[in-house]
Structure formats: C-alpha cells, structure tokens
Amino acid sequence: MKAVRKQDPAGSRASILEAAQELFLDRGFAGTSMSEIAKASGVTKSLIHHHFGSKEALWGSVKRRCFEAYHQQQVQLLAGQPLTPKTAKASMRIYYEHLRDNPQVLRLMWWMLLDGDDDRSNELVAELGDLGVEQIRGLQEQGVIRADLKPESILSGFLGLIHAAFTEGWMIERRDITPDGYVDEAWQMFASAVFVDPSD
C-alpha cells in the first residue's frame, strides 16, 4: 500500500491531510504525533516530511484546507466592490453558513485557542482580517461608519456575533428563532451600533 502511494504523490498528500485533519481536530496540535498521522494515513513519517516538511507545516496546511472555501467566498464578495451595509450583511451570512455547514472549522478554532496558536499564522485568515480592517477604515474616513471605534474592534464584534450562535447554546436556549432569523438579528445589532445610517 505504501509503495503505491509513493507513486501517487497527489493521493499520498491527500491521505496525509485527511488523516492529519481528523487527528488534529480530535486531539489538537500538541496532542497529535507524526507517528499517529503516519499510521492513520498509511504512509511513512519520512513521506510526510517529504510532502510537508514538518509537523508545524502540516498543521498550517490543515488550517488552510479548512478556510479555503470561506476565504474564496469572502474575497469574491468584498474585494471587487466597496463595503456597504448590504455587502457587510452578506459577509456575515457567509460566515454563519460556513460555520454551520463546517463544524470542524469551529473545532479547529477552539484548538488554536487552547494551543495558543495565532490566527495570523494562517495567511488566508490574515488576508481576510487585513481586508476587513481596510474596508472598515475606509468607511470611517468617509463618515459611513463611526470613527470613534477602532476598526479592529468593529471587526471583532462582527465575528463575535456569529461565533455566539454556535458557542452560547449551552447557556441560552433559543427555541423561537431560525438560523436566518438569528443572522437578521445579529445584523440589526451590529449595524445599529456601527453604521451612521444602517439603511444605506
């Protein structure tokens, strides 16, 4: 089996990533060994090092894999047009749907927090963060968004409202609201707090 995978670099790499993602999400970066990944993927440790170089680089590839689709959606939405209340709400919905449809991403984020990992180590996340801050700062300069708040704090609040939908269920039972309804309410709270005229 290993000999066949050595002749199939793409298949080997995919098998390693699949096994690494499953183990990292189950045990975290610190709790997962390269030997365990090699065993689960059916390859040698040397082949993992050949494809990824190190455990840290493999972890980075897993994080990139989890965020690629979300990154592409957000860049397509935000990079080609100015930020408006309409596009900001669409961005919020994309984030909500990504976490809803990919629960492994939220699990990954918790492991990153527990392991003391810096989100900025993921270039896709860093690019989106920089893009969001840049868009917010531009609207502050135009008088569209409140200028008395730091753009980084505004972006954190934006993301936090969506995180709460998935992390606060143990504390607050919401029987009377649909997922779409939650995003609408989260948007109303955010827009009324930061946009000078949220109806634009």
Language-model regions: role of each:
Residues 1-11, 18, 199-200:
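N-terminal intrinsically disordered/low-complexity leader segments
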Residues 11, 15, 19, 23-57, ...:
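Helix-turn-helix
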Residues 17, 59, 63, 67, ...:
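Amphipathic, non-transmembrane alpha-helical scaffold segments
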Residues 60-91, 132, 138:
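Amphipathic alpha-helical linker/stalk segments
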Residues 75-103, 151-158, 200:
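Hydrophobic alpha-helical connector segments
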Residues 93-100, 110-115, 189-194:
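Helix-loop "lid/cap" segments that line or gate small-molecule binding pockets
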